């Protein structure tokens, strides 16, 4: 199928759907609300980067990261220590060239009902076809305290995101793929 250059309006709408699909994955409304990940299409040589998770570029063409799979693995792991983990608030800002969003996550600890929260920020750049060319994620410092409770350790994971995903998968009651994140970073 031949690619078609999208109009500015189509690009903005698609970029908003990209952000809302991310939110739906974490809010577990994907099926109920009819959200899909069809708009999460990576361009050739697309990259992912986060200073917290490895601080290196991941080639998304050869190591695609599934938002749905990653959200599932984190939710399973985090729910062992937290009874109601998920997004509290979500804001997205679509534009012609991409979308930025802020997600406020939080939960009550099962052990003592203390509420813990953190913020995550994502930036996705897209091309004229609406394909993702670059995606990055940032978290605030409260994420460290949250992870200490949720998985027993925190980053930043400077060498590789593998250590984070191993901790998540070790804590998880199930095993499985983390959507290509493990071993995706050089190191």
Go through the PLM ranges and name each one.
Residues 1-187:
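C-terminal and inter-domain tail/linker signature
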């Amino acid at each position: 199928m031949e690619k078609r250059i999208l109009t500015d309006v189509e690009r903005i709408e698609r970029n908003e759907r990209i952000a809302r699909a991310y939110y739906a994955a974490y809010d577990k409304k994907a099926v109920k609300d009819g959200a899909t990940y069809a708009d999460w299409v990576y361009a050739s040589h697309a990259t992912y980067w986060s200073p917290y998770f490895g601080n290196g570029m991941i080639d998304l063409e050869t190591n695609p990261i599934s938002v749905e799979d990653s959200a599932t693995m984190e939710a399973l792991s985090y729910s062992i220590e937290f009874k109601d983990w998920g997004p509290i608030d979500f804001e997205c800002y679509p534009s012609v060239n991409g979308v930025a969003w802020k997600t406020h996550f939080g939960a009550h600890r099962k052990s003592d009902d203390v509420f813990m929260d953190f913020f995550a920020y994502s930036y996705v750049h897209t091309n004229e076809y609406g394909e993702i060319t670059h995606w990055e994620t940032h978290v605030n410092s409260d994420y460290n305290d949250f992870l200490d409770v949720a998985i027993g350790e925190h980053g930043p994971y400077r060498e590789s995101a593998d250590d984070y995903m191993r901790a998540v998968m070790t804590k998880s009651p199930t095993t499985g793929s983390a959507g290509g994140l493990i071993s995706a970073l050089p190191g």
